[in-house]
Amino acid sequence: MRLTSEARSIIVNRIADFSIEVGKQPVTIGQWLYMRPNMFLKIENYIPLKKFVQTDNIDDLFEFESEEEKETLLNKYRTLRYEQATTNTTLKE
């Protein structure tokens, strides 16, 4: 799993603003970008990431190796549950 090139570019260009938003040092954000991209799946980091990249689509933020990896990581960090809880969609019958 890794961030898409577009998402990574936005964070790199605005790393100071993003680090203030998440309350971490820019060096820490830099390590996350290249060595620990799963840290962006934590809800406290995921919400600012969506705000900075200006998208609600998980596939615009991350590139996963497989659907199994995607499902496993989204469930582990409860990102999928958060997305479902905040989405205001109703099923039409």
Write out the residue ranges for each language-model feature:
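A short, Lys/Arg-rich alpha-helix, primarily the initiator
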Residues: 1-21
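Secretory-pathway ectodomains
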Residues: 1-2, 21-25, 49-55
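Short, flexible helical or helix-coil boundary motifs
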Residues: 10, 22, 36, 56, ...
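Short coil turns linking two alpha-helices in DNA-binding domains
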Residues: 14, 25-30, 42
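A generic structural signal for ordered secondary structure
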Residues: 17-22, 41, 46, 61-62
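Phosphate-coordinating loops and pocket residues in cytosolic domains that bind phosphorylated ligands
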Residues: 31-34, 63
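Short, basic-rich loop-to-helix N-cap that marks the start of a DNA-contacting helix
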Residues: 35-51
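Short, charged recognition helix plus adjacent turn
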Residues: 59-93
